[in-house]
Swiss-Prot record:
Protein's UniProt name: LexA repressor
Annotated organism of origin: Pectobacterium carotovorum subsp. carotovorum (Erwinia carotovora subsp. carotovora)
Transmembrane segments: none
Family note: Belongs to the peptidase S24 family.
Name of encoding gene: lexA
Record's function text: Represses a number of genes involved in the response to DNA damage (SOS response), including recA and lexA. Binds to the 16 bp palindromic sequence 5'-CTGTATATATATACAG-3'. In the presence of single-stranded DNA, RecA interacts with LexA causing an autocatalytic cleavage which disrupts the DNA-binding part of LexA, leading to derepression of the SOS regulon and eventually DNA repair.
InterPro entries in the cross-refs: LexA, LexA-like, LexA/Signal_pep-like_sf, LexA_DNA-bd_dom, LexA_repressor, Peptidase_S24_LexA, Peptidase_S24_S26A/B/C, WH-like_DNA-bd_sf
EC number(s) given by UniProt: 3.4.21.88
Gene3D superfamilies registered for this protein in UniProt: Umud Fragment, subunit A, Winged helix-like DNA-binding domain superfamily/Winged helix DNA-binding domain
Listed GO biological process terms: DNA repair; DNA replication; negative regulation of DNA-templated transcription; proteolysis; SOS response
């Protein structure tokens, strides 16, 4: 399983878009110019990294010798820090993409969140793990959800009663978060559908 850095994803996207628009891949010089690299050699280093990860093939002896080996859609985006008031899946929040089949999860995963803290440790969700999330607002009491409260994003077990929502931790050291829907902004960003251990990617 492969992960692209944000810069590698930029290079990959540029190659894909250039092929879509012109029918041929860009030269190293064109990549360097488009992305602000100092020289074509810098572009070459990124191409070699993409080739090592198996997402492109470099054809030797040709200035445009680049062939794509994967489609972007196979990558699940990892969402980083989210600024207040902005959509969770805004492009600027996507740190990288993990080459994992979304259909591994039921329902399928739309994005990944890096878990921060140990509030859900009792059900095996640990600090640094990647939480696979299905984007939906259709959730039921008792499910593990990704919720946004006044622009803070958290992962907890849902319990809703009337105008009050209790977000329950799976760690006795953490008190429930109580949300008054009449006074606080609250939304469901998605349903947790699986966990990828942090050590799986080391």
């Amino acid at each position: 399983m492969k992960v692209l850095t944000a810069r590698q994803q930029q290079v990959y996207d540029l190659i894909r878009d250039h092929i879509a628009q012109t029918g041929m891949p860009p030269t190293r010089a064109e990549i360097a110019q488009q992305l602000g690299f100092r020289s074509p050699n810098a572009a070459e280093e990124h191409l070699k990294a993409l080739a090592r990860k198996g997402v492109i093939e470099i054809v030797s002896g040709a200035s445009r010798g680049i062939r794509l080996l994967m489609e972007e859609e196979t990558g699940i985006p990892l969402v980083g820090r989210v600024a207040a008031g902005e959509p969770l899946l805004a492009q600027e929040h996507i740190e990288c993409r993990y080459q994992v089949d979304p259909a591994m999860f039921k329902p399928s995963a739309d994005f990944l969140l890096r878990v921060s803290g140990m509030s859900m440790k009792n059900i095996g969700i640990m600090d640094g793990d990647l939480l696979a999330v299905h984007k939906t607002e259709d959730v039921r009491n008792g499910q593990i959800v990704v919720a946004r409260i006044d622009d803070e994003v958290t992962v907890k077990r849902l319990k809703k009663q009337g105008n009050t929502v209790h977000l329950l931790a799976e760690n006795e050291e953490f008190a429930p978060i109580v949300v008054d829907l009449r006074q606080q902004s609250f939304s469901i960003e998605g349903l947790a559908v699986g966990v990828i251990r942090n050590s799986d990617w080391s």
